[in-house]
Protein backbone atom coordinates (compact mmCIF):
# COMPACT_ATOMS: atom_id res chain seq x y z
CA UNK A 1 0.00 0.00 0.00
CA UNK A 2 1.26 3.48 -0.89
CA UNK A 3 2.79 5.78 1.65
CA UNK A 4 0.98 9.12 1.37
CA UNK A 5 2.93 12.28 2.18
CA UNK A 6 1.65 15.85 2.21
CA UNK A 7 4.27 18.42 1.22
CA UNK A 8 3.14 21.29 3.42
CA UNK A 9 4.13 24.58 4.97
CA UNK A 10 1.85 27.48 5.87
CA UNK A 11 4.49 29.85 4.50
CA UNK A 12 4.72 30.34 0.75
CA UNK A 13 7.86 30.38 -1.35
CA UNK A 14 9.71 27.68 0.58
CA UNK A 15 9.97 25.09 -2.19
CA UNK A 16 6.85 22.96 -1.68
CA UNK A 17 6.01 22.59 -5.35
CA UNK A 18 9.65 22.22 -6.39
CA UNK A 19 10.03 19.48 -3.80
CA UNK A 20 6.84 17.71 -4.83
CA UNK A 21 7.73 17.58 -8.53
CA UNK A 22 11.39 16.68 -8.10
CA UNK A 23 10.87 14.15 -5.33
CA UNK A 24 8.14 12.47 -7.40
CA UNK A 25 10.45 12.28 -10.43
CA UNK A 26 13.37 11.02 -8.34
CA UNK A 27 11.27 8.28 -6.74
CA UNK A 28 9.96 7.32 -10.19
CA UNK A 29 13.55 7.14 -11.46
CA UNK A 30 14.22 4.47 -8.82
CA UNK A 31 11.34 2.38 -10.25
CA UNK A 32 8.81 3.38 -7.60
CA UNK A 33 5.19 3.85 -8.67
CA UNK A 34 4.35 7.46 -7.88
CA UNK A 35 1.24 9.63 -7.93
CA UNK A 36 1.51 13.40 -7.50
CA UNK A 37 -1.63 15.27 -6.44
CA UNK A 38 -1.76 19.01 -7.04
CA UNK A 39 -4.02 20.57 -4.39
CA UNK A 40 -2.88 24.15 -4.95
CA UNK A 41 -5.32 26.23 -7.05
CA UNK A 42 -2.33 27.93 -8.69
CA UNK A 43 -1.65 24.67 -10.50
CA UNK A 44 2.11 25.13 -10.51
CA UNK A 45 2.83 21.46 -9.85
CA UNK A 46 0.58 20.63 -12.79
CA UNK A 47 2.39 22.97 -15.18
CA UNK A 48 5.79 21.99 -13.82
CA UNK A 49 4.95 18.35 -14.54
CA UNK A 50 4.30 19.14 -18.20
CA UNK A 51 0.48 19.21 -18.12
CA UNK A 52 -1.30 22.37 -19.28
CA UNK A 53 -3.72 23.43 -16.55
CA UNK A 54 -5.67 25.52 -19.08
CA UNK A 55 -6.52 22.46 -21.20
CA UNK A 56 -7.89 20.14 -18.51
CA UNK A 57 -11.22 18.43 -19.07
CA UNK A 58 -11.24 17.19 -15.47
CA UNK A 59 -9.11 18.09 -12.46
CA UNK A 60 -8.71 17.11 -8.84
CA UNK A 61 -11.51 19.58 -8.07
CA UNK A 62 -14.00 17.48 -10.05
CA UNK A 63 -12.79 14.40 -8.18
CA UNK A 64 -13.23 16.04 -4.77
CA UNK A 65 -16.80 17.13 -5.45
CA UNK A 66 -17.76 13.83 -7.08
CA UNK A 67 -18.17 15.01 -10.67
CA UNK A 68 -15.62 12.60 -12.15
CA UNK A 69 -13.78 9.43 -11.23
CA UNK A 70 -10.04 8.92 -10.76
CA UNK A 71 -9.46 7.59 -14.26
CA UNK A 72 -11.05 10.67 -15.83
CA UNK A 73 -8.89 13.08 -13.83
CA UNK A 74 -5.59 11.19 -14.11
CA UNK A 75 -2.72 12.36 -16.31
CA UNK A 76 0.83 11.14 -16.89
CA UNK A 77 3.96 13.28 -16.65
CA UNK A 78 6.10 12.20 -19.60
CA UNK A 79 9.25 13.89 -18.32
CA UNK A 80 8.66 12.96 -14.69
CA UNK A 81 7.58 9.35 -15.10
CA UNK A 82 4.74 9.65 -12.58
CA UNK A 83 0.96 9.87 -12.56
CA UNK A 84 -0.65 13.24 -11.84
CA UNK A 85 -3.98 14.45 -10.50
CA UNK A 86 -3.84 18.01 -11.85
CA UNK A 87 -5.24 21.30 -10.56
CA UNK A 88 -6.47 24.50 -12.12
CA UNK A 89 -8.28 27.61 -10.96
CA UNK A 90 -11.52 25.64 -10.50
CA UNK A 91 -9.98 24.48 -7.23
CA UNK A 92 -10.46 27.96 -5.75
CA UNK A 93 -14.16 27.11 -5.41
CA UNK A 94 -13.41 24.03 -3.34
CA UNK A 95 -13.26 25.94 -0.05
CA UNK A 96 -16.91 26.94 -0.36
CA UNK A 97 -18.24 23.78 -2.00
CA UNK A 98 -16.53 21.36 0.39
CA UNK A 99 -17.92 23.15 3.43
CA UNK A 100 -21.41 22.23 2.28
CA UNK A 101 -20.60 18.53 1.82
CA UNK A 102 -20.72 15.62 4.24
CA UNK A 103 -17.37 14.28 5.56
CA UNK A 104 -15.82 17.33 3.95
CA UNK A 105 -12.38 16.81 5.46
CA UNK A 106 -12.16 13.18 4.22
CA UNK A 107 -13.08 13.62 0.56
CA UNK A 108 -9.55 13.07 -0.70
CA UNK A 109 -8.82 10.14 1.61
CA UNK A 110 -11.99 8.38 0.47
CA UNK A 111 -11.22 9.04 -3.20
CA UNK A 112 -7.72 7.58 -2.88
CA UNK A 113 -8.72 4.46 -0.94
CA UNK A 114 -9.40 2.28 -4.03
CA UNK A 115 -5.99 3.00 -5.63
CA UNK A 116 -3.52 3.07 -2.74
CA UNK A 117 -2.36 -0.45 -3.61
CA UNK A 118 -1.48 0.74 -7.12
CA UNK A 119 1.34 3.01 -5.95
CA UNK A 120 4.40 3.01 -3.74
CA UNK A 121 4.23 6.74 -2.97
CA UNK A 122 1.56 9.41 -3.22
CA UNK A 123 2.77 13.00 -2.81
CA UNK A 124 0.36 15.90 -2.25
CA UNK A 125 1.33 19.49 -3.05
CA UNK A 126 -0.56 21.66 -0.54
CA UNK A 127 -1.50 25.34 -0.77
CA UNK A 128 0.38 27.69 1.61
CA UNK A 129 -2.38 27.91 4.22
CA UNK A 130 -4.33 25.70 6.59
CA UNK A 131 -7.34 25.59 4.27
CA UNK A 132 -9.97 22.93 3.66
CA UNK A 133 -7.75 21.66 0.85
CA UNK A 134 -4.75 21.34 3.15
CA UNK A 135 -6.96 19.69 5.75
CA UNK A 136 -8.04 17.10 3.16
CA UNK A 137 -4.39 16.46 2.33
CA UNK A 138 -3.42 15.97 5.97
CA UNK A 139 -6.36 13.69 6.71
CA UNK A 140 -5.41 11.57 3.68
CA UNK A 141 -1.71 11.36 4.59
CA UNK A 142 0.53 9.12 6.64
CA UNK A 143 3.08 11.86 7.15
CA UNK A 144 4.05 15.45 6.41
CA UNK A 145 7.23 16.56 4.68
CA UNK A 146 7.96 20.18 5.60
CA UNK A 147 10.21 22.12 3.21
CA UNK A 148 11.60 25.29 4.75
CA UNK A 149 14.24 27.90 4.16
CA UNK A 150 16.79 28.41 6.90
CA UNK A 151 15.68 31.86 8.00
CA UNK A 152 14.31 33.07 11.32
CA UNK A 153 10.77 33.87 10.18
CA UNK A 154 10.46 30.35 8.78
CA UNK A 155 11.62 28.92 12.08
CA UNK A 156 9.08 31.04 13.94
CA UNK A 157 6.19 29.78 11.80
CA UNK A 158 7.28 26.18 12.10
CA UNK A 159 6.01 25.91 15.67
CA UNK A 160 2.48 26.87 14.54
CA UNK A 161 2.59 24.30 11.75
CA UNK A 162 3.71 21.53 14.11
CA UNK A 163 0.91 22.43 16.53
CA UNK A 164 -1.67 22.28 13.73
CA UNK A 165 -0.39 18.88 12.60
CA UNK A 166 -0.71 17.59 16.16
CA UNK A 167 -4.28 18.88 16.45
CA UNK A 168 -5.28 17.21 13.19
CA UNK A 169 -3.63 13.97 14.29
CA UNK A 170 -5.53 14.06 17.58
CA UNK A 171 -8.93 14.79 16.07
CA UNK A 172 -9.04 13.46 12.52
CA UNK A 173 -6.07 11.27 11.58
CA UNK A 174 -4.21 9.41 14.34
CA UNK A 175 -1.75 7.98 11.79
CA UNK A 176 -0.44 11.43 10.86
CA UNK A 177 3.11 12.33 11.86
CA UNK A 178 5.91 14.60 10.76
CA UNK A 179 7.85 12.53 8.26
CA UNK A 180 10.70 15.00 7.99
CA UNK A 181 11.90 18.57 7.70
CA UNK A 182 13.73 19.54 4.53
CA UNK A 183 16.12 22.47 4.27
CA UNK A 184 15.62 24.16 0.88
CA UNK A 185 17.33 26.97 -1.06
CA UNK A 186 20.30 26.45 1.22
CA UNK A 187 23.48 28.51 0.84
CA UNK A 188 26.26 27.38 3.20
CA UNK A 189 28.07 30.68 2.66
CA UNK A 190 25.36 32.49 4.63
CA UNK A 191 25.83 32.48 8.38
CA UNK A 192 22.06 32.87 8.87
CA UNK A 193 21.42 29.62 6.98
CA UNK A 194 23.98 27.82 9.09
CA UNK A 195 22.65 29.25 12.37
CA UNK A 196 19.04 28.27 11.65
CA UNK A 197 20.16 24.85 10.41
CA UNK A 198 21.91 24.28 13.73
CA UNK A 199 18.73 25.22 15.61
CA UNK A 200 16.70 22.79 13.52
CA UNK A 201 19.14 20.00 14.33
CA UNK A 202 18.88 20.84 18.03
CA UNK A 203 15.08 20.90 18.13
CA UNK A 204 14.14 18.19 15.64
CA UNK A 205 17.13 15.83 15.61
CA UNK A 206 16.44 12.75 13.45
CA UNK A 207 13.32 14.32 11.94
CA UNK A 208 15.59 16.68 9.98
CA UNK A 209 16.62 15.17 6.66
CA UNK A 210 20.36 14.83 6.15
CA UNK A 211 19.80 15.85 2.54
CA UNK A 212 19.92 19.60 1.95
CA UNK A 213 18.49 21.19 -1.20
CA UNK A 214 20.83 23.93 -2.47
CA UNK A 215 19.97 27.12 -4.25
CA UNK A 216 20.27 26.03 -7.86
CA UNK A 217 19.39 27.80 -11.08
CA UNK A 218 18.38 24.54 -12.79
CA UNK A 219 15.69 23.94 -10.17
CA UNK A 220 14.33 27.40 -10.93
CA UNK A 221 14.48 27.00 -14.72
CA UNK A 222 13.07 23.49 -15.11
CA UNK A 223 9.37 24.26 -14.37
CA UNK A 224 9.18 26.75 -17.24
CA UNK A 225 9.94 23.81 -19.54
CA UNK A 226 7.34 21.59 -17.86
CA UNK A 227 9.82 19.13 -16.45
CA UNK A 228 11.63 18.20 -13.24
CA UNK A 229 15.31 19.05 -12.85
CA UNK A 230 16.20 15.39 -13.38
CA UNK A 231 14.90 15.61 -16.95
CA UNK A 232 16.13 19.16 -17.54
CA UNK A 233 19.71 18.67 -16.30
CA UNK A 234 20.29 15.37 -14.52
CA UNK A 235 23.80 16.37 -13.42
CA UNK A 236 22.72 19.62 -11.77
CA UNK A 237 23.20 20.02 -8.04
CA UNK A 238 19.45 20.37 -7.60
CA UNK A 239 18.64 17.14 -9.45
CA UNK A 240 21.29 15.21 -7.54
CA UNK A 241 20.03 16.59 -4.22
CA UNK A 242 16.49 15.38 -4.87
CA UNK A 243 17.79 11.96 -5.92
CA UNK A 244 19.59 11.85 -2.58
CA UNK A 245 16.38 12.87 -0.80
CA UNK A 246 14.45 10.08 -2.53
CA UNK A 247 17.03 7.57 -1.34
CA UNK A 248 16.87 8.92 2.20
CA UNK A 249 13.06 8.81 2.19
CA UNK A 250 13.04 5.17 1.09
CA UNK A 251 15.60 4.22 3.74
CA UNK A 252 13.59 5.97 6.45
CA UNK A 253 10.60 3.76 5.79
CA UNK A 254 12.54 0.88 7.31
CA UNK A 255 13.21 2.75 10.56
CA UNK A 256 11.00 2.96 13.68
CA UNK A 257 8.44 5.79 13.81
CA UNK A 258 9.59 9.18 15.00
CA UNK A 259 7.66 11.23 17.55
CA UNK A 260 6.91 14.86 16.66
CA UNK A 261 8.72 17.53 18.64
CA UNK A 262 7.84 21.18 18.98
CA UNK A 263 10.17 24.11 18.61
UniProtKB/Swiss-Prot annotation:
Pfam families per the UniProt record, alphabetical: AAA_31
Domain of life from the UniProt record: Bacteria
Listed Gene3D superfamilies: P-loop containing nucleotide triphosphate hydrolases
InterPro entries for this protein: AAA_dom (IPR025669), DNA_Partitioning_ATPase (IPR050678), P-loop_NTPase (IPR027417)
SUPFAM superfamilies, alphabetized: P-loop containing nucleoside triphosphate hydrolases
Transmembrane segments: none
UniProt cross-references to CDD domains, sorted A to Z: ParAB_family
Family: To B.subtilis soj.
UniProt xrefs under PANTHER family: P-LOOP CONTAINING NUCLEOSIDE TRIPHOSPHATE HYDROLASE, PARA FAMILY PROTEIN CT_582
Protein name, UniProt field: Uncharacterized protein PP_0002
Species this chain originates from: Pseudomonas putida (strain ATCC 47054 / DSM 6125 / CFBP 8728 / NCIMB 11950 / KT2440)
